[in-house]
């Protein structure tokens, strides 16, 4: 299948929004290996675009300074594009709680803008990058990403005779991405602690950036329109993750692990104790593949399997040895 996926992207013109973020940047770097015609990277961060252009040093990269809120800019960016990966978003839960209007403008209106210009341009495939926080959301960020998902899936119903296939990829927590827990832990341990833990019972689904990008590129290749693709992911207790990181990193920075305090600070605004990958209603339209779940559009039956565990508190937790192994695989330890 790898060769089929590689061939799919060959000679394509591809647009990646949010292309300087952790996921977007890795999508761009991986796509370059498949010999596309052009990759257009749209981002609001001028400095990050400049750095990306110099890092990749490829004539296939075109950097577009722009915001998904600006529909006119999107019209220019999407001209003659074959495939869209929509990774631009406001993603930090507490910041979105305090800036809800801004979250709506980017995550909802921005997604609508991009869908509409993609439809008019009749791009071949359109993938929205979503999050497990969109499942039964309790915070602004999750609610806006739920709307982004629904807008994307619903676009298949109102596109008329246009050919674009709109689909969604739903992620768990991406390890060592910008703003995630791992970079924060490293900084706290460097300073001798304390290391902050919001709640001792908190659990999360985790995945590496490489796993995330593989899922996105495979999902886009498979997409027919209307599907939600979800990577199968392990779950961790955040407390276990923190203890492993302290045990491994404290000696590297001249501290004894037992001297690094773990300070309980309480849940942040909008934060859940556990995450969910799939809502109950989606199970009836769900198919389980080797490495992912696929939720099909309403009215399309998947394999009915009511035994699927779809929240991080009931999933089997990684033990500390396996956590350590994963952290070494992503070159964090």
Swiss-Prot record:
CDD domains for this protein: UDP_invert_4-6DH_SDR_e
Question: SUPFAM superfamilies, per this entry?
Answer: NAD(P)-binding Rossmann-fold domains
**Annotated Pfam families:** Polysacc_synt_2 (PF02719)
* Span of the signal peptide: none
Q: Which InterPro entries match?
A: NAD(P)-bd_dom_sf (IPR036291), Polysac_CapD-like (IPR003869), Polysaccharide_Synthase-Rel (IPR051203)
- Which family is this protein grouped under? Belongs to the polysaccharide synthase family.
**What is the name attached to this protein's record?**
Uncharacterized membrane protein MJ1061
Native organism is: Methanocaldococcus jannaschii (strain ATCC 43067 / DSM 2661 / JAL-1 / JCM 10045 / NBRC 100440)
